[in-house]
Amino acid sequence: MIIPAIDLIDGQIVRLYQGDYGQQTTFDLSPQTQLQSYQDQGASWLHIVDLTGAKEPAKRQTALIAKLTAGLNANIQVGGGIRTEEQVAELLSLGVKRVVIGSLAVKEPELVKGWFNKFGSEAICLALDVNINQNGEKIVAVSGWQSGGGKSLESIVEDFSQVGLKHALVTDINRDGTLTGANTALYRELSSHYPHIAWQASGGIATLEDVAAVRDSGAAGIIIGKALLINQFNVAEAIQCWPNE
């Protein structure tokens, strides 16, 4: 499945290079118009990242997300700076279908597991951003990649499988925003080890060949941001390559 994505800082569409706020590109595009275009081309899921909220949780762009969600029929998945049960409940009440939880799942797993029990495993997607070291270990970074986490991807997946983990978005940090192609070996390995989880691939997508490679890796979906913004290909072409389930 193709999941077009936009990242938002202060209401504007941006891209960060490898998660670095110092390497930011701003696009002169309306978030509403952009998401509407993605929906019109056939996207059934859209992914919104609140980068302002990820950096400063007190400045979460909830009002904008509410407006965007209200204007769209597609399913919306939202991440960035979500720290409390109340925030999860608020987003779901606004019509967001799935909330993405990143750093907090690593730092406070028991808290987040409680949310799985309360809201159900369809309503939560874990975002696991990995640094793969020389030994091939997948170490999950936390806090918007600004600091290392030290837990292995596998240990987190095993832990959250106890509460029915169904959706996980995995980004190879070294590929993100680089347009160098996805780490398909990573998604192939995860899909074969944990077939009960719908893996979302993210990072490095540049061409329709990359989309096809991820499709064939066993991943359930692919998050595409930068490639669409710079017109490497469009959503309709991507869906032709990998139709929605």
Swiss-Prot record:
Location relative to the cell: Cytoplasm
Record flagged with keyword Manganese: no
Superkingdom: Bacteria
EC main group: isomerase
GO CC terms, sorted: cytoplasm
Active site (UniProt): D7 (proton acceptor), D129 (proton donor)
Biological pathway: Amino-acid biosynthesis; L-histidine biosynthesis; L-histidine from 5-phospho-alpha-D-ribose 1-diphosphate: step 4/9
GO molecular function (one): 1-(5-phosphoribosyl)-5-[(5-phosphoribosylamino)methylideneamino]imidazole-4-carboxamide isomerase activity
UniProt cross-references to Pfam families, sorted A to Z: His_biosynth (PF00977)
InterPro entries assigned: Aldolase_TIM, His_biosynth, HisA_bact_arch, Isoase_HisA-like, Isoase_HisA-like_bact, RibuloseP-bd_barrel
Keyword list, A-Z: Amino-acid biosynthesis, Cytoplasm, Histidine biosynthesis, Isomerase
Protein's UniProt keywords contain Cell membrane: no
EC code: 5.3.1.16
Primary location group: cytoplasm
Protein's GO biological process: L-histidine biosynthetic process; L-tryptophan biosynthetic process
Reactions that this protein is recorded to catalyse: 1-(5-phospho-beta-D-ribosyl)-5-[(5-phospho-beta-D-ribosylamino)methylideneamino]imidazole-4-carboxamide = 5-[(5-phospho-1-deoxy-D-ribulos-1-ylimino)methylamino]-1-(5-phospho-beta-D-ribosyl)imidazole-4-carboxamide
Family from the record: Belongs to the HisA/HisF family.
Protein name, entry field: 1-(5-phosphoribosyl)-5-[(5-phosphoribosylamino)methylideneamino] imidazole-4-carboxamide isomerase
UniProt organism field: Shewanella sp. (strain ANA-3)
Species classification: Bacteria, Pseudomonadati, Pseudomonadota, Gammaproteobacteria, Alteromonadales
